[in-house]
Amino acid sequence: MNGDPLFDGAGPADVLEAAPTARTAVAWLPPQELWPAIQDIRWEHDPQVRRWPPHVNLLFGFVPEEEFARAVPLLSAGAAESPAFTARLSGVRYFRHRQYATVWLDPAAAGPEPWTRLQRTLGLRFPLCRGHGGRFTPHLSLGRTQDPRRLAAECAARLGTRTAVVEEVVLLSRHGEEPMRPRARITLGTGEVRRLPEYWPRGRGSGGRWM
């Protein structure tokens, strides 16, 4: 991994029991051709649009950056066991919270099994990063609202049905108030690791903003 201190200096192990932090995550990022329609909605409705790229979280929070040297070989091993699959992104749903609702695009419209299998395969190696025992629901957040039915219907009409190949997972982290930045991309089926010191897709915005 080319001498990068984030990743070098430790060999693989079966599991890594490190306490999670909200400053890191393992996620799937949709291909860039899907970003404009998603980001147009997020800029209107998502207060986290400057902090997060469009994403489906698989492990959040994840281990702190100082553990990446040990975490990356485990992610690579899990990714190597997980074949790529085609996801259908269709339908907009919402989670209700006390003060608002989170509206989200469903990336598992073709069935949750491949997502669940991928999340389980990765999560087995990080037992403290698997949440609190709740059911894993893959989702791509679009925004917050007091009127989720109206916004969900509007977003569904704007987005329609999209498909994308889930062929890699991305390791993200942030420093201070900076956005979440991809640090590595890990290919499903092979476990190949590509280090990414910076990754800013072209398009709307710059200077620390996601497109």
What role is predicted for each listed range?
Residues 2-211:
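Histidine-dependent nucleotide/RNA phosphoesterase domain, centered on the 2H-phosphoesterase fold
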